[in-house]
Amino acid sequence: MYNNKLKVCSGPETTGWISEQLMTGKIPVTDIFIDIDNKPDQMEVRLKPSSRSSTRTCTSSSQTEVNYVPLLKKVEDTLTMLVNATSRQNAAIEALENRLSTLESSLKPIQDMGKVISSLNRSCAEMVAKYDLLVMTTGRATSTAAAVDAYWKEHKQPPPGPALYEENALKGKIDDPNSYVPDAVQEAYKNLDSTSTLTEENFGKPYISAKDLKEIMYDHLPGFGTAFHQLVQVICKIGKDNNLLDTIHAEFQASLADGDSPQCALIQITKRVPIFQDVPPPIIHIRSRGDIPRACQKSLRPAPPSPKIDRGWVCLFKMQDGKTLGLKI
């Protein structure tokens, strides 16, 4: 009876059941540990299921390993390709960043030239408007003023020759209702009003605003809110009030061309341009010392009796408590 159960059952459950039966004495020890020589059949029966199970398990494990090896190889190859592609992409991005940095550095001088070019453009437009009054065409230069007038009235256009008019004479013709002046000439005369400031003295010197000059000087100075930044504001304000921004700009560029530092160039302006000589610095009203920029704190000094800009006094800070501090460079 016991042997039949052994033939049917196998695995851990059988082992546990046999141990329980042995401990309780329900199965004799001789029925379990049989003699191979005397009972070969029973031994064979007991070992066969174990042998088949072991073989089946081994075969299944080997089959699983065989199935996973190609998949793992594919995953490894794919990851390798992905890493290589990412490395190439990173290298390309780094090269692109370097190119962009180089390009940005190359374009900075052009950006600085933009303001000067804009001023030149305005001056050139005014100059063209002024010369547009000289209504000149190619051809013979024998037409008199009367002949030109007659030709205009008849053909509604200038004759094929030069027709030069003085400004006052042309103004008289435009104001005279009996005289005929082509619309193009009248328009050119009106445009002359915008060129009234363009004279022989300032021709070729493009007008620059106080804001543009301040930005140009700021671009050359390191840091922010320093005593020299404050000096730039004072220079631009006084230069604007005296209509000498172009002169100040020329002095600044000349000092830089001579190899001076931006700070030295600003000091030279206060010493060379006459409007800064023996001029007291402006007074700035503040609530307390904390309103003064941090970068200027170390340059504050007690104000002397008569400070001057050309002696290094940029401005005076007057606080609500009556105390006055001077910004000295």
UniProtKB/Swiss-Prot annotation:
Top-rank taxon: Viruses
GO terms (BP aspect): symbiont-mediated suppression of host cytoplasmic pattern recognition receptor signaling pathway via inhibition of IKBKE activity; symbiont-mediated suppression of host cytoplasmic pattern recognition receptor signaling pathway via inhibition of IRF7 activity; symbiont-mediated suppression of host cytoplasmic pattern recognition receptor signaling pathway via inhibition of TBK1 activity; symbiont-mediated suppression of host toll-like receptor signaling pathway
Phosphothreonine: residues bearing it: T195, T199
Subcellular location: Virion; Host cytoplasm
Disulphides: none
Residue(s) of cross-link: Glycyl lysine isopeptide (Lys-Gly) (interchain with G-Cter in ubiquitin): K298
GO cellular component, one term: virion component
Ranges for domain VP35 IID: 204-329
PROSITE patterns for the chain: VP35_IID
Annotated InterPro entries: Filo_VP35, VP35_IID, VP35_IID_b-sht, VP35_IID_hlx
Comment block on domains: The interferon inhibitory domain (IID) binds dsRNA.
Function in brief: Plays an essential role in viral RNA synthesis and also a role in suppressing innate immune signaling. Acts as a polymerase cofactor in the RNA polymerase transcription and replication complexes. Serves as nucleoprotein/NP monomer chaperone prior to the formation of the large oligomeric RNA-bound complexes. Regulates RNA synthesis by modulating NP-RNA interactions and interacting with DYNLL1. VP35-NP interaction controls the switch between RNA-bound NP and free NP and thus the switch between genome replication and genome packaging into the nucleocapsid.
Complex formation: Homodimer. Homooligomer; via the coiled coil domain. Interacts with nucleoprotein NP and polymerase L; VP35 bridges L and NP and allows the formation of the polymerase complex. Also interacts with VP30; this interaction is regulated by VP30 phosphorylation. Interacts with host IKBKE and TBK1; the interactions lead to inhibition of cellular antiviral response by blocking necessary interactions of IKBKE and TBK1 with their substrate IRF3.
Annotated protein name in UniProt: Polymerase cofactor VP35
UniProt organism field: Reston ebolavirus (strain Reston-89) (REBOV)
